[in-house]
């Protein structure tokens, strides 16, 4: 709907002079900067025009007498002896001349495409090479393995895994610590370094390394109390390491007040564990090696995975082997040492986490379309190991974790796999809080991010998803407000997902944001920091940048074509309408090169619909609108002689476009589809006539009547049918109504458009006399309801509609081409983002301009 009504008010007596002088009733100044006032008796039409340069004259024209009276200092334009409105819209931010000057080397040079093709092959090879997971070494875990002893032939103890001890000996950093050199985290360095010093001291070797390591620990222990928050795992494990170091005679400042506090806190938690004779709390299992004093080593064996590990942790597994001699633990560790060349990672296997994370990473970067088969293979693998209990990092993980499960739920559902959100209930405590709230380390924060993202895909009445949203959203907002982590990449991701949740996230905008914040040297954190080479990958980033720029160059060519068409057709000279070619193009939310014809058709039709919207609301009389509608119904240009010339021109441009696009549709579909194409246009213009009749009669419809009419006049029907028929897939006649009007998904997306629009435009429309909005109709149906009540109700309706639309979209339907479904479904995105704060179509604001610049104008530096 246009945001400017035909009249500023229906009752001149009710408004009086206030309509002219009250700034509340002249709110159009900032959006349309014009107003009409009609009186019942004399049908007096008042045009008030305010130019951008300040107040100007207002001309009052009486249609009954033909006389005019200047009531302020401006002039009026009369067309065919009928006063017409000529709206002073916000200027077009992307003028024809601006678009035509765009240049890029990525369209003309084949070098970029050739390099992109090479990278696609390399990344496919990476997919094909996926095994149990590629992950960086962990000094902390390797030191645990190095501490293990065996009995030599002379009865003395010796290292059971000397290769692990050698690795520790050879991998100290220059500052005396152990860890990932490029990333410093105090807790990570202290765990790695303390355990490495212990391992060397146990075997009385590396005296120089021990001395340097002890000095590093002593210097940094004093900083520990300055950390914002210590993870629960650290609070259990680190005091235990200090006890071991003290027993070995390693010289450290054990009497520091904060160290004593940590030890006291640990003792209290150990008392709780001792009281739970048959169970170790789930949130403490990850710190198993810090619980040696209280573990029943017979009972703990029930937590052993099929691969012999405990929670896929080499450190925990080494601790159990040290205390039990279990052969399966030995085999697990021995195999890891062979695989990683004398060291071990912080967890293994990670085959499920790696596959899910790689798919998620590829799709975030906007390059998923190049790897459809590889993605399917990876997700088929994950789905084979999916469980109602959830999943862990690897297929043999005995205890599921929230991060992998939430990521799996989202990714699998996104790709049409049947997964229930009830799996999330396994990660809530008795108070309904998810396990992730136990601590605020990076990995736990990451799990809440994926919990939030999973809840984006909620279906109606999914309690688990609603609970996840209620937990995750405030958690993440608080994390942003308090800055509990210095992880820049993660925080940028949190900012994006909170600001632009899935129903508002335009694919190209998401890709641009992810590329701009991508870190190919990124680390994750469990007990210690770790890298996953398949994710911290420069090849993926390089391809994403090249692909974005190559696709952007195509989009620029399309925009040039479209702005040129708009100008040459004469539509750019129409002064009663908004000129929003770039914004309408952005609204398609479809970026793939193969859908070029779809985008072009959608944009041309959409631009004309904006014009028709403004024509109906601003320019045309009711009789003229009826004549125009009759021409549409009869598909006949000969009925236009009674309407103004500019309206005739608009009709002819539209009619010519319909013929051209229909010819293109015939080529793709192999048959004439005009009968299908005409129907939504007839419905569309019939609704305009109905709305005008209600307005002229001063009638406010019921909420139900309103939706039946206004959800159609929002215009998705006409602007989507021909584009989806140009997507290259055959759409049978009986399938058209399954994907288009009146399908459930189509109506739900239209409903979300209509009502989301209303929440940001109703006040300005009300001030200008356009009484029928969703808010007003709801208040009419519910006497006593306030505007706030109505908005809350509408937001609930929109939320429900989006959930139902998601259900319809993901529901299996083999006869409906997926590209067509996606095109319709993705149109929900633009209305959510365009009306996030204001009327993004009516007001050409900088935020929308910035979106378009990022996606279509500014290339990414390669």
Curated annotation (Swiss-Prot):
Cofactor: Mg(2+)
Cofactor note: Binds 3 Mg(2+) ions per subunit.
Biological pathway: Alkaloid biosynthesis; taxol biosynthesis; taxa-4(20),11-dien-5alpha-ol from geranylgeranyl diphosphate: step 1/2
SUPFAM superfamilies: Terpenoid cyclases/Protein prenyltransferases (SSF48239), Terpenoid synthases (SSF48576)
Motif window: DDXXD motif: 613-617
Record-listed E.C. numbers: 4.2.3.17
Key words of the record: Lyase, Magnesium, Metal-binding, Taxol biosynthesis
GO molecular function, one term: terpene synthase activity
Gene Ontology biological process terms from the UniProt entry: paclitaxel biosynthetic process
Positions bound to Mg(2+) 1: 613, 617
InterPro entries linked to this entry: Isoprenoid_synthase_dom_sf (IPR008949), Terpene_cyclase-like_1_C (IPR034741), Terpene_cyclase_plant_C1 (IPR044814), Terpene_synth_N (IPR001906), Terpene_synth_N_sf (IPR036965), Terpene_synthase-like (IPR050148), Terpene_synthase_metal-bd (IPR005630), Terpenoid_cyclase/PrenylTrfase (IPR008930)
Residues annotated as binding Mg(2+) 2: 613, 617
This protein's record includes keyword Protease: no
Pfam families: Terpene_synth, Terpene_synth_C
Catalytic EC class: lyase
UniProt-annotated binding residues for Mg(2+) 3: 757, 761, 765
Enzymatic reactions: (2E,6E,10E)-geranylgeranyl diphosphate = taxa-4(5),11(12)-diene + diphosphate
Function: Catalyzes the cyclization of the ubiquitous isoprenoid intermediate geranylgeranyl diphosphate to taxa-4,11-diene, the parent olefin with a taxane skeleton.
Family statement drawn from the similarity comment of this UniProt entry: Belongs to the terpene synthase family.
PANTHER family tied to this protein: (E,E)-GERANYLLINALOOL SYNTHASE, ENT-COPALYL DIPHOSPHATE SYNTHASE, CHLOROPLASTIC
Entry note about domains: The Asp-Asp-Xaa-Xaa-Asp/Glu (DDXXD/E) motif is important for the catalytic activity, presumably through binding to Mg(2+).
Name of the featured protein: Taxadiene synthase
Gene assigned in the entry: TDC1
């Amino acid at each position: 709907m246009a945001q400017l009504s035909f009249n500023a008010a229906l009752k001149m007596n009710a408004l009086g002079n206030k309509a002219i002088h009250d700034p509340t009733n002249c709110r159009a100044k900032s959006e349309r900067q014009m107003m009409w006032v009609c009186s019942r008796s004399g049908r007096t039409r008042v045009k008030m025009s305010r130019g951008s340069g300040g107040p100007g004259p207002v001309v009052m024209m009486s249609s009954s007498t033909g006389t005019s009276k200047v009531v302020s200092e401006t002039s009026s334009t009369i067309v065919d002896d009928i006063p017409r409105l000529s709206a002073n819209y916000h200027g077009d931010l992307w003028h024809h001349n601006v678009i035509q000057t765009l240049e890029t080397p990525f369209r003309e040079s084949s070098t970029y495409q050739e390099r992109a093709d090479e990278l696609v092959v390399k990344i496919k090879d990476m997919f094909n090479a996926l095994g149990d997971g590629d992950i960086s070494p962990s000094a902390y875990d390797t030191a645990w393995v190095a501490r293990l002893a065996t009995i030599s032939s002379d009865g003395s103890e010796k290292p059971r895994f000397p290769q692990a001890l050698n690795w520790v000996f050879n991998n100290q950093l220059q500052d005396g610590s152990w860890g990932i050199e490029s990333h410093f985290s105090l807790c990570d360095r202290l765990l790695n370094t303390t355990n490495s010093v212990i391992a060397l001291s146990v075997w009385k070797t590396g005296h120089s390394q021990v001395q340097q390591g002890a000095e590093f620990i002593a210097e940094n222990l004093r900083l520990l109390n300055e950390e914002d928050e210590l993870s629960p795992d650290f609070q259990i494990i680190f005091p235990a390491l200090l006890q071991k170091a003290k027993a070995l005679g390693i010289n450290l400042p054990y009497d520091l007040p904060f160290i004593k506090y940590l030890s006291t806190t640990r003792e209290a938690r150990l008392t709780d564990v001792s009281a739970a004779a048959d169970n170790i709390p789930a949130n403490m299992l990850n710190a198993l090696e810090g619980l040696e004093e209280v573990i029943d080593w017979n009972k703990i064996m029930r937590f052993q995975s099929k691969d012999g590990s405990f929670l896929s942790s080499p450190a925990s597994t080494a601790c159990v082997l040290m205390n039990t001699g279990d052969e399966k633990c030995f085999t697990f560790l021995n195999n890891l040492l062979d695989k990683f060349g004398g060291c071990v990672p912080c967890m293994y296997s990670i085959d499920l986490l790696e596959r899910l994370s790689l798919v998620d990473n590829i799709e975030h970067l906007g390059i998923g379309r190049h790897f459809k088969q590889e993605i399917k293979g990876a997700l088929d693998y994950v789905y084979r190991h999916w469980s109602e209990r959830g999943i862990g990092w690897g297929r043999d993980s005995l205890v599921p974790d929230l991060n992998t499960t939430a990521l799996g739920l989202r990714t699998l559902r996104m790709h049409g796999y049947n997964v229930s959100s009830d799996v999330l209930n396994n990660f809530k405590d008795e108070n309904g809080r998810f396990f992730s709230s136990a601590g605020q380390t990076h990995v736990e924060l990451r799990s809440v991010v994926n919990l939030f993202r999973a809840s984006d895909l909620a279906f109606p009445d999914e309690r688990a998803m609603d609970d996840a949203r209620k937990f995750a959203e405030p958690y993440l907002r608080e994390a942003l407000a308090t800055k509990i982590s210095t992880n820049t990449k993660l925080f940028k991701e949190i900012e994006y997902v909170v600001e632009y949740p899935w129903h508002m996230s335009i694919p190209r905008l998401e890709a641009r944001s992810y590329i701009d914040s991508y870190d190919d040297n990124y680390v994750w954190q469990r007990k210690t920091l770790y890298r996953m080479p398949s994710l911290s990958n420069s090849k993926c980033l390089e391809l994403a940048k090249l692909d974005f720029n190559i696709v952007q160059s195509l989009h620029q060519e399309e925009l040039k074509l479209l702005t040129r068409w708009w100008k040459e057709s004469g539509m750019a000279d129409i002064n009663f309408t908004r000129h929003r070619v770039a914004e309408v193009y952005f609204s398609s939310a479809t970026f793939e090169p193969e859908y070029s014809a779809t985008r072009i058709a959608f944009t041309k039709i959409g631009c004309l619909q904006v014009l028709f919207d403004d024509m109906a609301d601003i320019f045309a009389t009711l009789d003229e609108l009826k004549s125009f509608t009759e021409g549409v119904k009869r598909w006949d240009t000969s009925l236009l002689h009674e309407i103004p010339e500019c309206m005739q021109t608009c009709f002819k441009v539209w009619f010519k476009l319909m013929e051209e696009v229909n010819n293109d549709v015939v080529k793709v579909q192999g048959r004439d589809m005009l009968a299908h194409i005409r129907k939504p246009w007839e419905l569309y213009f019939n609704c305009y006539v109905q709305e005008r009749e209600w307005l002229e009669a001063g009638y406010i419809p019921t909420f139900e009547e309103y939706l039946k009419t206004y959800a159609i006049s929002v215009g998705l029907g006409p602007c989507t049918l021909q584009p989806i028929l140009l997507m290259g897939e055959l759409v049978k006649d009986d399938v058209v109504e399954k994907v288009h009007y009146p399908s459930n998904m189509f109506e739900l997306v239209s409903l979300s458009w209509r009502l989301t629009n209303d929440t940001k435009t109703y006040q300005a429309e009300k001030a200008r006399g356009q009484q029928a909005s969703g808010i007003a109709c709801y208040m009419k149906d519910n006497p006593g309801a306030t505007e706030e009540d109505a908005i809350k109700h509408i937001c609930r309706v929109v939320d429900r509609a989006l959930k139902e639309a998601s259900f319809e979209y993901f529901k299996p339907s083999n006869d409906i081409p997926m590209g067509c479904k996606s095109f319709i479904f993705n149109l929900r995105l633009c209305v959510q983002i365009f009306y996030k704060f204001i009327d993004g179509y009516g007001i050409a604001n900088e935020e929308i301009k910035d979106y378009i610049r990022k996606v279509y104008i500014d290339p990414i530096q390669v």
